[in-house]
């Protein structure tokens, strides 16, 4: 077994939701990072309430010994001129670089239905044309080049309601892109909800996986997502996602595969939930307890 060095962090989306700001609108940035620290996490991703100035954000985080792992970037490579996406990406890159992050989470939002309340995440998800696939692959490689200019990497986030959701779509993107320029984010919750096998994806692309999201899925709500043709956001409100150990996913074989692979990077606990229904601090503690007991994740000092 290879030596594994893992940084364990948690996303702010359980405290306040970027796609639906009304969820957790009363929660302050400082409350969120205080509770992350109290729960024992070492890092976080960037949420919509975080200070936009790197120096200010670093001050708040340093007081709590927290680090920034990454932050989401919405690309529109299939629907807009490349230059528009690149200009926004460079600003995003420079912010994350200033914060000491090594990877940049990128997801294509061209034709995406993930933010539309009236569109079924399954029935209405986009399917790219051959030309759009070419634009996506070429554009991602160019963004990868821009990231490498400052010693960073892009990690592509397969996501419900987008054109890269299924195993076949992930396979196509990985085949069409240079491994040195485009890496992969591995998200357990999105794979399971989509009906994919997370172990298959991890084992197939372990050499390209440079960032991990641990998200669990509630079986009943996942079934309702299909049966009732719900949108992604409606599913979030309905509670389809939860933290590891609270849903249907068996994380033990996934963790064993991660250990065997020698993965070196962040694992981010992530669960889009309504904080009025699922207290984010309690769920952060629940996830940490489960991960500590079940996997005994070795973390860097």
UniProtKB/Swiss-Prot annotation:
Its EC number is 4.2.1.44. GO terms for biological process: inositol catabolic process. One of its GO terms (molecular function) is myo-inosose-2 dehydratase activity. It catalyses: scyllo-inosose = 3D-3,5/4-trihydroxycyclohexane-1,2-dione + H2O. Keywords: Cobalt, Lyase, Manganese. Pfam families: AP_endonuc_2. Pathway: Polyol metabolism; myo-inositol degradation into acetyl-CoA; acetyl-CoA from myo-inositol: step 2/7. Its cofactor is glutathione; Co(2+); Mn(2+). This is Inosose dehydratase.
